[in-house]
Amino acid sequence: MLYSLAQKFMFQMDAEQAHDLAIKSLKFTANSPLACGYSQALQSSPVNCMGITFPNPVGLAAGLDKDGEAIDAFHAMGFGFVEVGTVTPKPQAGNDKPRLFRLTKAKAIINRMGFNNKGVDNLVRNLQAKKTDILVGVNIGKNKDTPVEQGKDDYLICMDKVYPYAAYITVNISSPNTPGLRTMQYGALLDELLASIKAKQAELAEKYHRYVPVALKIAPDLTADEIESIAMSLISNQFDAVIATNTTLSRDGVEGMTHGTEMGGLSGAPLTAASTMVIKQLASFLNKKIPIIGVGGINSAQDALDKFDAGANLVQIYSGFIYQGPKIIKEIVNAVKMK
């Protein structure tokens, strides 16, 4: 009830202004009596993935809390884990505004944010300041002005800094809003990046006496051959997980709608089937050698169950959370318990 009132108010505002207000409000109310407005108790539904025991299989996808400002509030809502970021070595403003658009009729969002964030050092301070023990994954990317050929250096810089505080680290090479980034999903560039990440992981594991898993986040706009190639690279480089999928460049399901032709990545309900298909194909190629975190168009408990049936070990939500509110977390956890 409270969320539906807040949503009604927020949906009258510009999408990015509403997002920023929500994060500020959650940051202010977290760990205070005001958190009772959105906190909820969930049944325990532990899942072991990447060598980590998650209290439940429902996580917050990267992009909502880029700078890790409201982590404790999301813990109160019942998320099993939170993924912050995408964060880059240097702060960057991102693309010009407006750059975030609701397509309410389709329960969808288009964004062309462009990795706007306050930089990795700021994120580390926020990770140090969190008061709860919620598991936090950190999604890392490259700065816009870093050439693709040197992109791996940005990932290694971020990895170095977040490693002591992250439950796992996600390498994001699949945002459509950083020029050239998706070219890193293929061939020699991908293998070079994955090998560099694994070498850095080994170095940091020895330094901190702690193994932090690494995951790769991929796009939905891939052919079966490209998915197979990525799967083989993940296996050969012994990556710990893959996150499928990021936003899509397709506009199927939003044709003719207001904002439907805006540039950027489309998320939400129109992505549901495509994302689930990528998970299914990945699962067949990976043959349970590497776990899959499913994300993309989860707007109901059934959507989440479909992701699990396709081969996902965990799921993440973002657009569905915006449209449904915290109740969707409980609905998914309860549905998983009943399976």
From Swiss-Prot:
Keyword Repressor assigned: no
What this protein needs as a cofactor is: FMN
**Recorded topology in the membrane:** Peripheral membrane protein
Q: List the molecular function annotations (GO) for this entry.
A: dihydroorotate dehydrogenase (quinone) activity
CDD domains this protein is in? DHOD_2_like
Positions annotated to bind substrate: 66, 111-115, 172, 177, 246-247
InterPro entries per record: Aldolase_TIM, DHO_dehydrogenase, Dihydroorotate_DH_1_2, Dihydroorotate_DH_2, Dihydroorotate_DH_cat, Dihydroorotate_DH_CS
Top enzyme class, one word, equals: oxidoreductase
User: What is this protein's function per UniProt?
Assistant: Catalyzes the conversion of dihydroorotate to orotate with quinone as electron acceptor.
- Name of the featured protein: Dihydroorotate dehydrogenase (quinone)
What lineage does the source organism belong to? Answer: Bacteria, Pseudomonadati, Pseudomonadota, Gammaproteobacteria, Alteromonadales
Q: Which gene encodes it?
A: pyrD
